[in-house]
């Protein structure tokens, strides 16, 4: 089987390409902090056994008295919300290199994992709950996105696609399929375009300002065998290993299925499948010379 790799560079003003189809959605409800939200986020995001972030606070230690910890978190979050400023200490990531398989001395055989401060994940969980209520429960999220949603899985997507293709093949039609893999999709997000996508999806007010500040001024450092290297600024993408990262990515690509003038596009996170139906390939190429 032959494969084709296509590299596409998206310009900073790429939002303008989709503006005619990506209409502004109803405005989101203002973000509010309360003990119930913090406790839900704490239970969901703090998992004993997970690695600690730059502050070295362990999940197991925080779980020992989660009510007292949640109360302390509430003060920090409320002050952060008032100023629309994400705590700078929570914008730092610790990166470690983990072998892909066994022991290796080759640089390419390692993959980086990013460790965030656990309190930041709790705060992200509170913010993410508000985004989900607006974006998913409000029906704004594209039905073609199968990732990051409760009740949806790769198995359901595969069944959906293969059944649709089978029905067309039974009609003696031809199915053309293009499997698209976005290289470093989460790391390549342009923050300027992300801001425009947030506005178009109805995210405004203190939540919008907080997310923009959350993305800006982030830093990371590499840790090797306990040795901490120099911090570096992160100017693109959403934080790896974060709670908000997948949600922001979903907003970023939410209008992608509406871009092709023909065919069908389905996504599971950044894995994308584009399919077209036709009787004869030559005829389809003449009629649909561009997608």
Task: Identify the role of each PLM range.
Residues 1-108, 114, 122, 228, ...:
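Surface-exposed loop/turn segments and immediately adjacent short secondary-structure elements
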Residues 4, 38, 53, 73, ...:
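Mobile genetic element proteins and their domesticated derivatives, centered on retroelements
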Residues 6-15, 48-52, 71, 83-88, ...:
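Short helix-interrupting loop/turn segments at helix-coil junctions
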Residues 34, 54, 58, 65, ...:
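Hydrophobic (often cysteine-bearing) scaffold residues that line and stabilize catalytic clefts
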Residues 35-46, 72-80, 126-131, 155-168, ...:
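Inter-domain linker/hinge segments that demarcate the starts of reverse transcriptase
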Residues 48-57, 95, 106-115, 156-196:
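Conserved catalytic palm subdomain of right-hand nucleotidyl-transferase polymerases, strongest
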Residues 108-139, 156-162, 183, 235-262:
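Conserved pre-motif C helix in the palm subdomain of viral-like polymerases
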Residues 182-269, 277, 281:
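Conserved polymerase palm-domain catalytic core
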């Amino acid at each position: 089987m032959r494969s084709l790799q296509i590299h596409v560079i998206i310009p900073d003003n790429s939002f303008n390409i989709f503006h005619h189809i990506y209409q502004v959605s109803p405005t989101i409800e203002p973000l509010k902090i309360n003990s119930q939200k913090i406790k839900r986020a704490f239970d969901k995001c703090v998992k004993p056994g997970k690695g600690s972030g730059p502050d070295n606070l362990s999940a197991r230690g925080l779980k020992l008295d989660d009510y007292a910890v949640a109360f302390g978190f509430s003060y920090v979050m409320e002050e952060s919300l008032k100023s629309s400023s994400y705590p700078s200490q929570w914008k730092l990531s610790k990166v470690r290199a983990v072998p892909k398989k066994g022991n290796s001395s080759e640089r390419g055989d390692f993959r980086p994992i990013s460790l965030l401060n656990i309190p930041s994940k709790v705060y992200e969980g509170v913010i993410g709950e508000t985004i989900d209520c607006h974006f998913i429960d409000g029906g704004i999220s594209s039905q073609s996105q199968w990732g990051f949603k409760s009740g949806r899985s790769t198995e359901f997507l595969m069944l959906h696609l293969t059944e649709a293709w089978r029905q067309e093949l039974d009609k003696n039609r031809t199915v053309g399929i293009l499997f698209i893999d976005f290289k470093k999709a989460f790391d390549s997000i342009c923050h300027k375009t992300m801001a425009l996508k947030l506005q178009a999806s109805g995210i405004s007010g203190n939540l919008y300002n907080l997310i923009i500040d959350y993305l800006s001024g982030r830093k990371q450092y590499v840790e090797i065998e306990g040795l901490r290297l120099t911090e570096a600024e992160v100017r693109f993408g959403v934080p790896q290993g974060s709670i908000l990262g997948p949600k922001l990515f979903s907003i970023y690509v939410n209008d992608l299925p509406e871009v092709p003038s023909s065919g069908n596009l389905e996504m599971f996170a950044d894995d994308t499948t584009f399919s077209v139906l036709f009787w004869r390939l030559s005829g389809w190429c003449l009629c649909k010379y561009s997608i």
